[in-house]
A protein has these predicted regions:
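Short, charged amphipathic recognition helices of the HTH superfamily
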Residues: 15-29
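Glycine/small-residue-rich loop that forms an oxyanion/phosphate-binding "nest" at active or ligand-binding sites
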Residues: 66
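Conserved mixed alpha/beta core segments that line enzyme active sites in large multi-domain catalysts
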Residues: 100-103
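Single, function-defining residue in the core of a domain
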Residues: 1-16, 34, 40, 44-47, ...
Length: 406
């Protein structure tokens, strides 16, 4: 199977049996021709998964370098989010050897991948993704991704939001030294004395690098940076979570106060949760964990190709929403948005016809048909909707509100 067919078949992957996957693809691309499962998988094993990393990064670079693109920002900054997620994979001796065991001692083996992503929360694009073992060093992965993000976004200003448990003292120091703007939620035990001493909701705090704070890093690669100074400064912002002002979170940041007053930090940090939604889309809507096979190379191909399709879907949905911005915001009771599930479903079903079409004019016509159909399917965005969280398996196997896209 040629490389282009191999690539297109993975983009077109629907998570059904491999025989039916190949039958469907070959009927569209090469009617009357068949390929065996072993022959197809043999070709797949020769393809480096990094090819799909290059593919989605190429798309991202074009997206951010487009002079006509209207990028969503907050006070002129792209809002990036860094976080990790567990990806369930088939448990075999090979996957255990490559990725490790995620289960506790003396329990059944369970192979997992730790996926670390850097995400543009406002433009809904996955900028970078790294496959790791479970329980990986998320901050180290995030730092590497932040260091290379300029290759994708160019010289555009950005800030990074991170959850509690992400940055420690060395990471804070490196980001401050490199002039990387960040917002990180603190645990109650992080800089506990400084948190308890806060007299206002927005203060500049001097963090003293005492012996007890340094000892954890002695003899490690972080020793030099924690010994390079006696103190450093953080801005701590208290964000109240309810009207009674009984619950709050403390955020650590180095953002300038004149551009980001304390009042905007609730909304700013809330944007980080869009990365959790992006992970849900990958796993639920795009069925990322419904793998082609059990070999590590196949798993990584499926993960990276799914990220590529996700970014394409968001690019199209965002383009439609910008084109119809006034109509979607003003002509309905609620602000309207493109139905992401339907967008993904249409792309999974129809994108293959565009990829296989050799005539550029027909390609354009086919894409316009998909574009027009997606633009007609919009759903309301209802603000401040909250549902009580119930733990446990209360629903049936098939959700009535989250139907499959394809």
């Amino acid at each position: 199977m040629p490389l282009d067919d191999l690539t297109f078949s993975m983009i077109n992957r629907k998570g059904i049996s491999l025989k039916l996957e190949l039958r469907g693809y070959m009927n569209i691309s090469h009617p009357g021709t068949q390929i065996s499962n072993p022959g197809y998988l043999k070709q797949r094993m020769k393809l480096n998964p990094e090819a799909f990393v290059d593919l989605y990064q190429f798309h991202n670079r074009n997206f951010y370098s487009d002079p006509d693109a209207e990028l969503y920002t907050m006070n002129g900054f792209l809002v990036l989010a860094a976080d990790g997620s567990d990806v369930n994979i088939p448990t075999t001796p090979e996957t255990i050897a490559v990725y490790g065991n995620a289960s506790r001692n003396n329990t059944k083996l369970c192979a997992q991948i730790g996926l670390g992503c850097l995400y543009d929360a406002l433009n809904r694009m996955i900028l970078d993704a790294a496959i790791n073992k479970p329980k990986f060093n998320e901050m180290a992965v995030a730092e590497a991704q932040i260091a290379s993000v300029r290759e994708t976004i160019g010289d555009k200003p950005f800030l990074v939001t991170m959850d509690r448990g992400y940055p420690g003292i060395p990471a804070f120091l490196r980001m401050i030294d490199s002039q990387t703007y960040f917002v990180a939620r603190l645990k109650s035990c992080d800089f506990k004395a400084e948190q308890q001493a806060l007299a206002a909701d927005d203060e500049d705090v001097s963090i003293q690098l005492t012996k007890s704070r340094r000892k954890h890093y002695m003899g490690t690669a972080d020793e030099a940076i924690v010994m390079s100074r006696d103190s450093f400064h953080l801005r701590m912002v208290r964000v109240w979570l309810n009207e009674d002002r009984t619950e709050y979170e403390i955020l650590a940041t180095n953002l300038p106060r004149d551009q980001f007053p304390a009042e905007c930090f609730g909304e700013l940090y809330h944007l980080r949760w869009r990365l959790e939604t992006a992970y849900q889309v990958l796993k639920d809507r795009l069925q990322m964990e419904n793998f082609t096979g059990t070999k590590p190379v196949l798993l990584e191909q499926d993960i990276y190709s799914t990220i590529y399709v996700s970014n394409i879907a968001e690019d199209i949905a965002r383009d439609i929403e910008q084109e119809q911005a006034d109509h979607l915001r003003n002509d309905y009771k609620h602000r309207m948005a493109v139905n992401r599930s339907l967008c993904i479903g249409l792309l999974k079903n129809d994108l293959i016809y565009i990829l296989l079409e050799k005539d550029r004019q027909k390609q354009t016509e086919l894409f316009q048909q998909i574009y027009d159909e997606i633009s007609k399917n919009i759903v309301p965005v209802r603000p401040d909707r909250h549902y009580k969280r119930t733990k446990g398996q209360l629903a049936s196997k098939y959700s009535n509100t989250h139907k499959r896209c394809y």
